[in-house]
Amino acid sequence: VYKRQLLRSDQQLLQPGGVYVDLSSIAKGFAVDKVAALLDSHGVNNYLVEVGGELLGKGSKPYKQPWRVAVERPIAGVREVEQVVDLKNMAVATSGDYRNFFESDGRLYSHTIDPRTGYPVEHQLASVSVLHKSAMMADGLATAMTVLGPDEGMAFAKDHELAVFFIVRTNKGVEELSTPAFDAIVEGK
């Protein structure tokens, strides 16, 4: 028995019940990719698809203007821009705890559960945005970076040459951290 799962001798993995599987970490990105594929199949060359905050931009707006999207400053109840990204045949997905959290005994907890512990993540990462050709991959990676936190997440993102933008809470407010791959895309290199 491993974490409520049984591995039978014939190599079948059985789950006898009691476990909930939540695919929301990739569902919106999956939907964005499916809509984009449909548009592509009909010869649409310029579009911006958005589902629940996950976006994919292809081509450009009228007059060759880029699809520009904002990464919000992670402050509950406030909508301010932290970073602007031009989506050039690229998707962006953001995960964070500044809107989705719960309170228990006067303490705020992230809605993101660390599968390694079974408890809400506990670190100072407020928001993470990932750029990728696939919205589903960006969506899943944003959640993974949220679980890993700023230090492990940055190391993983750099090792895998991912385009990731972290916003970390500090005693003085927030600090922006980004990978070289993110900087290259944002700076148009």
What are these regions (language model features)?
Residues K3-K189:
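Mature catalytic core of soluble alpha/beta enzymes
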